[in-house]
Regions:
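Intrinsic disorder/low-complexity polar-acidic segments
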Residues: 64, 68-167
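Feature for intrinsically disordered/low-complexity regulatory segments and propeptides
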Residues: 1-73
């Protein structure tokens, strides 16, 4: 998806066994615990971003949800003219990835104030939080507006566990 490339979010996350060096300098690898690792990737300007551990101590029950899968979630809404992609961003070094679409469900208050509605999907590459799909009248563009949107009473709200495949 083009929005992922432009926002430098066209990377994947993978589970890799936790590794460490023991007291005698030998490399060790866990069979039970994993790290969630953002793959090395190349930005549009040619800069190579090295692999980065986003979270650690996860079990094999955790199923990472890729950024591309989140973008595909919005395709039906966009293809049917119900929404347009508005924002794609990451917070905390890619630990939270947020995609925002502006919906056609806008309205006007008495006095002429226009209220626009957005639908966003936030995936947490932290190993702890669920994917959140929510509607909001707050346009999410940074951590402050993201936090404000989480405090709203959402008309549409869903949670997706990382224990299941998001297909």
């Amino acid at each position: 998806e083009q929005i992922l490339r432009v926002a430098d979010l066209d990377w994947n996350v993978n589970m890799k066994p936790v590794q460490w060096t023991n007291a005698v300098g030998e490399s060790q690898e866990s069979e039970k615990y994993f790290s969630l690792v953002r793959e090395s990737h190349t930005r549009q300007d040619g800069t190579i971003v090295p692999e980065q551990i986003l979270s650690s101590g996860l079990t094999d029950q955790y199923k990472p949800i890729q950024n591309m899968r989140m973008a595909k979630f919005f395709n039906e809404y966009i293809d049917n003219g119900v929404a347009t992609m508005e924002t794609a961003m990451s917070l905390f070094g890619g630990r939270i990835v947020i995609l925002v679409a502006k919906t056609n469900e806008n309205f006007e208050l008495a006095g002429g104030d226009k209220i626009e509605q957005y639908l966003y999907c936030a995936s947490y590459h932290t190993g702890r939080d669920q994917v959140k799909v929510r509607s909001s009248s707050t346009r999410v563009v940074c951590n402050n507006t993201f936090s404000a949107s989480l405090r709203e009473n959402a008309a549409v709200q869903g949670l997706i566990s990382h224990r299941y495949d998001f297909t």
